[in-house]
């Protein structure tokens, strides 16, 4: 009888310790805004006709949804899906007497994966490092082509300006998608054990679509800030 009691006590303690060790695992949800600058990188077809690096910007409102697995006290791994709205503006120009500028803007549905490594510092503070990627599916946009002679535009207007719907984007670009990769580092300030404010920095890259007729394309390097709220357990 004593052996049975000892065995049951041992099992109870083991289960209690196991439950405690993984008590912080759980559902995770983040809602955030991000925004920053783009450095345009023309592809070979664009460089061959004189296009140089250009500027641009992006912004997005996304939700990250998934589960955090507690590996040990103070460290967890999150597996998160990412979806939301993204706005991207790309621009590039030639550096010649007859200056040609091309800009494009897209409103997109963003879909991707962003696994994160969560580090807890105790108390109200936490840190997360994320690496992931996905696709942006342009729903609408705008394409503009400008010509300037010695830095001036005689009539002050665009040579070509097109408002684009999804079907226009499909007929004009190949592929009609924007691939992206992203790395982020976020600081979490916890108000409770499961609610925190997020302050972050992201770096990324866009693999923008190429024009079907000319093969001209413009990729981009992105850098920016993100703010949001996190709902889920501490690491």
Tell where the protein language model's regions lie, with residue ranges.
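Small side chains
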Residues: 18, 26, 36, 66, ...
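Residues at beta-strand starts and edge strands
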Residues: 25, 57-59, 77, 195-197, ...
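Gram-negative (and chloroplast) outer-membrane scaffold detector with strong preference
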Residues: 33, 57-154, 191
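N-terminal targeting signals for Sec/Tat export/insertion, comprising classic cleavable signal peptides
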Residues: 36-64
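Cleavable N-terminal export/targeting peptides
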Residues: 1-26, 234-235
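Outer-membrane beta-barrel architecture
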Residues: 12, 62-66, 112-118, 182-186, ...
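Predominantly the C-terminal beta-signal and adjacent terminal strand-loop region
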Residues: 29-31, 40-51, 84-88, 105, ...
